[in-house]
Amino acid sequence: MNNIRTIKGGTKLKGKIKVPGDKSISHRALIIGSIAKGNTTIEGFLHSEDPLSTADCLRKLGVNIPKIIKDEPFTISGKGLDGLKEPKEILNCGNSGTTMRLLMGLLAAQEGKNFILTGDASLNERPMGRVGKPLSLMGGKISGREFGNKAPISINGEKLKGCVIGTPVASAQVKSAILLAGLNASGTTSVIEPASSRDHTERMLKAFGADISIRGELGRNIVITSGGNLIGQRILIPGDISSASFWMIAASIVPNSEVLIQNVGLNPTRTGILNVMDSMGCNYEILDKSTIAGEPIGSIKVKTSNNLRSFTVEGDILPKLIDEIPILTVAACFCSGVSEIKDAQELRVKETDRLKVMARQLQKFGAKITEKEDGLIINGQSKFHSAEVDSETDHRVAMSLAIASLLAKGTSKIMRAGAASVSYPTFWEELDKLTN
């Protein structure tokens, strides 16, 4: 994570690429495949640090997961809903909040078994009470530092009771943890969200045979009933639109660029980036649309756009593009007028405080950004000069700064550029490919 990358500004992007498998779906394929009956074969898995942390934890829970080799399919032998073993050691989730939060839900319902979850220094400072509190309403026994809000987290598996839970924030991780707990809870568990969040868990549980339904206004009420079994499936994981977004924005704002990104997941709970690109006036088209295992996919062709318009991101669209805010902040610097990010407090408790970090680092290039409690105000039509910037160990910051460097006059340095490997291990190779 400590390596340095140098990037020469003024370089156009040309070519076609495939982005790595979707990180969210990779986590869920491992977890749901592990508690299904029979075998689950996974293709297109994201071979990066976070999903590999999930695989390592599941192995310690007794799941037979082979060594995962990049770009090769593999098969999990599922243990069934109550077949996980009490581990002999602490489960280390690395830097992955998804791993920790989803496992909290899964393990809280493993009656009579005890577990301890920890992570790296960054993860152990991220809020976990947002998962622990709703699980406690179901009868879960979860404790941790700062009144259960921070890891290490201790879980005493219990027989949980289904209930109706309203989540204070639209979070796919919180929702997914409750649904996974609901698989082993008595009766019916209902999750009501304030806004729709990404729905990969619901789609995959349904594909595996769970009794799950989507109800209410805008699909914000998800109901799961226990009592059945999950049956192993063959899962083909599409490319991650959050990873594709770096190239989509880069091709839009770097002069004379044209990029085709193939086989990208187009789940409607994840395509907020396309809505913003429409508002900006970006020049793109979606090709080769299809649906695989309930997930819509397609290829996205993007060409440079002139006179991009400023935009505002706020409200219900935030959950659909929460991971794209860093690269959209870069885009805003090159739009006409003033753009604004609102209602984005969630970014302050990601791998870093992404609002603060993006403002601090882009200002080094000459960006005019004002930080607010819940977002950013970005003045457009910036003229970037070269700078030495730092990912501050955040993968999405590292990649966003790389794209920003292409717009800077001169050669820029990115410190701790290796952070990109958390979600996109081949990012730097792809950047070299598209710029040469």
Curated annotation (Swiss-Prot):
Instruction: List keywords of the entry alphabetically.
Output: Amino-acid biosynthesis, Aromatic amino acid biosynthesis, Cytoplasm, Transferase
Matches recorded under SUPFAM superfamilies: EPT/RTPC-like
The superkingdom of the source organism is Bacteria
Catalytic activity, as annotated: 3-phosphoshikimate + phosphoenolpyruvate = 5-O-(1-carboxyvinyl)-3-phosphoshikimate + phosphate
Q: Where are the transmembrane segments?
A: none
Kindly identify the residues recorded as the active site.
D323
PANTHER family reported for this sequence: AROM/DEHYDROQUINATE SYNTHASE, PENTAFUNCTIONAL AROM POLYPEPTIDE
- Write out the function statement from the record: Catalyzes the transfer of the enolpyruvyl moiety of phosphoenolpyruvate (PEP) to the 5-hydroxyl of shikimate-3-phosphate (S3P) to produce enolpyruvyl shikimate-3-phosphate and inorganic phosphate.
Annotated family:
Belongs to the EPSP synthase family.
Protein name stated in the entry: 3-phosphoshikimate 1-carboxyvinyltransferase
Q: What species does this protein belong to?
A: Prochlorococcus marinus (strain MIT 9215)
